[in-house]
Regions:
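Accessory DNA-binding and partner-docking regions appended to nucleic-acid-acting proteins
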Residues: 1, 350-352, 381-603
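Helicase motor core with emphasis on the C-terminal RecA-like subdomain
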Residues: 1-8, 12-16, 20-42, 50-52, ...
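Short helix-to-turn junction characteristic of helix-turn-helix DNA-binding domains
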Residues: 25, 221, 272, 362, ...
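Flexible coil/turn residues that form the inter-helical turn or adjacent wing/linker of helix-turn-helix
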Residues: 160, 225, 365, 415, ...
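Short, charged low-complexity linear segments at domain edges
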Residues: 347-376
């Protein structure tokens, strides 16, 4: 088993749980696997496929994901193919013939195509196992429900002797139970890997408005020169606006959302995978279909609707284990809009609960990673040291006067205002709505003009979290003072607020700027700290040339992590090259000579 792992994938040992899952599947038993993005789920069914007679059938929701997986397998010397509507009939006919003749070890197929072929092609194949990837799509409780997945339950009826492995990166308890029920899994063993991704840094910025977000995004990307990233936006129009802003600043960007033609979406994805653009500005539709291992950053322009969605989306970064950064912007406007969506949905109580947990993460003043892990049932007593709260623990001050000013303005407006107009009143802005409604005559008009608007938005988020007011979602999102707020307003209680740090001070504390080519030693990546940045860039250039020759994404030739290891260890023979973790026999023979010749020039 280990020899096969080394030969095809280049690894000397398994990651946690992988060997147990593989042995369980080799015993022809069903399994449900929960493992984070980048945790090594694919090997859990790809290795058994190589060790078993016949063909493994892998159900995947997106053609682009199938393409990526098949290219990766073929680059490792493994016979694999994808049966889908993007192929012409000749190509699909050839694939069907190869399956019936047992020439493929893995066949990737969509749920719709699987059902169409269930009584035809699949009956004529020797199937070693079924793998249901992105299995959370089968559950209406999951965050990415796809109705066509619900018919996968027919597999055990038609092929009772074939084991099924269902895999997902995120699924809470109710979703796990639904997956097992819908697929009719037979006494499955549930494998739950640690959801911790220590290589991902976690940062939240609260109360930012559009201009401030744009500046923060540009500063953030400037710390990642030439490195790929994704910006998730709540709306299509916002994705387009952000992409235009980046383009004007000379950052090559693409847009991806459901309103574009499939050709435009495919083009955007292809440009991103092949490093022709640095950033993709997208709605939640983007990301599941890619296996790009060297995404170095993910930004959420808006608050996601659930921790599952958030975790899956930040999981696009750092799949190769290298240091990667995530940034979430959080505002009251997002919270109000998402609450409305959740209230109007068919699953109001569940969606509101999920949103509340996401809100708790964004407002946290304790280690953010502990909150994420706790949500997935994994408790830890240690802080991560790699989130903004751990790096810069919050300091508090007596903010009673600030809170009283805000609550007084709410009270004097007869609790008939939302957050936007409240900030205008406090700042003394003569907006049309303020003057039309006579709020410029209030005693509190301009009472907080010394506090920047962004800080007011942050303080209002804190006040909401502290329970000083509530949002009446059924009354145009007006703010209503609570009993706790009344106590502060009339001096019966004091209010402690978190000090808002200026960006410059935060960066000075963090000392965060790092070169794109040098791994951060503190992170548990197992990487030596002796590599040459110059050699790494030369290796990256060679990798790009080889990838272009084969019309492959660069990360499929060799991952960034492998390039870092090559740069640090500098193998001077093909045999030494093949000993690097992540380089299998096929890649050693195919690429060893050219990479070793280049490395010798730097030795």
């Amino acid at each position: 088993m280990l020899q096969t792992l080394k030969t095809y994938f280049g690894y000397d040992s398994f990651r946690p749980l992988q060997e147990d899952i593989i042995r369980h599947l080799m015993d022809r038993k069903d399994a449900l696997v929960l493992m984070p993005t980048g945790g090594g789920k694919s090997i859990c069914y790809q290795l058994p496929a190589l060790l078993s007679e016949g063909t493994a059938v892998v159900v995947s929701p997106l053609i682009s994901l199938m393409k990526d997986q098949v290219e990766t397998l073929c680059a490792n010397g493994i016979a694999a193919g994808a049966l889908n509507s993007n192929n012409d009939e000749t190509e699909n006919a050839s694939l069907r013939r190869a399956c019936m003749e047992g020439k493929l070890k893995l066949l990737y197929i969509s749920p719709e195509k699987l059902l169409a072929e269930a009584n035809y092609l699949l009956r004529d194949m020797h199937i070693s196992l079924f793998a249901i990837d992105e299995a959370h799509c089968i559950s209406q409780w999951g965050h990415d429900f796809r109705p066509e997945y619900t018919q996968m339950g027919i597999l055990h009826q038609l092929f009772p002797q074939v084991p099924i492995i269902a895999l997902t990166a995120t699924a809470d308890k109710i979703t796990r139970e639904d997956i097992i029920k819908q697929l009719h899994l037979n006494q499955p063993r549930i494998f739950i890997s640690s959801f911790d991704r220590p290589n991902l840094s976690l940062t939240v910025k609260r109360g930012y408005q559009q201009k401030e977000k744009s500046k923060a995004i540009l500063d953030f990307i400037a710390r990642h020169p030439g490195e790929s990233g994704i910006i998730y936006c709540m709306s299509r129009s916002k994705a387009e606006t952000v992409a235009q802003m980046l383009q004007k600043q000379g950052i090559k960007s693409a847009v991806y959302h459901a309103g574009l033609s499939s050709a435009r979406r495919d083009e955007a994805q292809d440009d991103f995978i092949n490093d022709r653009v640095q950033a993709v500005c997208a709605t939640i539709a983007f990301g599941m279909g890619i296996d790009k291992s060297n995404v170095r950053w993910v930004i959420h322009y808006n608050l996601p609707k659930s921790i599952e969605s958030f975790y899956q989306e930040i999981g696009r970064a750092g799949r190769d284990g290298m240091p990667s950064d995530t940034l979430l912007f959080y505002s009251l406007a997002d919270l109000i809009l998402l609450t409305k969506f959740a209230t109007d949905s068919g699953q109001q109580s569940i969606n509101l609960e999920k949103l509340q947990r996401m809100q708790q993460y964004a407002e946290a003043d304790i280690c953010r990673r502990r909150i994420l892990l706790s949500y997935f049932g994994e408790n830890t007593t240690c802080d991560c040291g790699n989130c903004d709260v751990c790096k810069n623990p919050p300091e508090r001050f007596d903010g009673t006067i600030i809170v009283q000013k805000a609550l007084s303005a709410i009270a004097r407006s007869e609790q008939q205002i939302g957050t936007g107009i409240l900030v205008d009143i406090l700042r003394g802005n003569m907006s049309s709505e303020v003057t039309e409604r006579g709020y410029h005559r209030l005693k509190t008009f301009g009472a907080g003009r010394e506090v920047p608007a962004r800080d007011w938005h942050d303080y209002l988020l804190q006040m909401l979290q502290l329970g000083y007011f509530e949002i009446a979602y059924n009354e145009n999102n007006h703010l209503k003072i609570t009993q706790s707020g009344t106590d502060v307003l009339f001096g019966r209680a004091r209010a402690l607020l978190v000090t808002i740090r200026r960006e410059e001070a935060v960066q000075a504390t963090r000392g965060r700027k790092r070169k794109a080519t040098v791994p951060t030693k503190e992170l548990p990546l197992g990487l030596p700290n002796t590599e040459s940045g110059e050699l790494f860039e030369a290796l990256r250039t060679l990798r790009k040339r080889l990838a272009d020759q084969e019309a492959l994404p660069a990360y499929i030739v060799l991952s960034d992590k492998v390039l870092h290891l090559l740069s640090a260890s500098r193998p001077t023979t093909i045999e030494e090259f093949g000993n690097i973790s992540g380089i299998g026999e096929y890649k050693k023979k195919k690429y060893g000579k050219e990479f070793v010749e280049l490395i010798r020039k730097y030795s």
